[in-house]
């Protein structure tokens, strides 16, 4: 989870994730929407890939990036577990 927290700590990486909510995109298309250098974008994409938040797939000479939805489900579950949210035993529900 430390890798995920580090990846999410940067506002540019969060902006990349918001852009990718619209769907799969090339690095060039992402770069067109951000005021950062392409080399900087590449570093941010690598951090997001290392955290398993983004999946990169080569299509010919182009690499396309998309959100790794399964990873977000795992992250949300881990945070909910950490906070004790959603645990029926904790809520005291009788049934």
Report the location of each language-model feature.
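Residues in the helix-turn-helix
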Residues: 40
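Core alpha-helical elements of the protein kinase catalytic domain
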Residues: 45-46, 87
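N-terminal helix-turn-helix DNA-binding core of bacterial DNA-binding proteins
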Residues: 2-37, 59-72
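Alpha-helical residues within the helix-turn-helix
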Residues: 32, 43, 49-50
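Extended rod-forming repeat segments used as scaffolds/tethers
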Residues: 17, 51, 79-80
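Amphipathic alpha-helical dimerization/coiled-coil segments
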Residues: 69-95
């Amino acid at each position: 989870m430390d890798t995920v927290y580090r990846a999410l700590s940067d506002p540019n990486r969060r902006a990349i994730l918001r852009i990718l909510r619209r769907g799969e995109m090339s690095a060039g298309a992402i770069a067109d929407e951000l005021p950062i250098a392409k080399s900087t974008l590449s570093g941010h994409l690598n951090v997001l890939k290392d955290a398993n938040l983004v999946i990169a797939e080569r299509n010919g000479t182009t690499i396309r990036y998309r959100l790794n939805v399964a990873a977000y489900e795992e992250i949300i579950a881990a945070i909910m577990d950490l906070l004790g949210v959603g645990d029926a035993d904790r809520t005291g529900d009788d049934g």
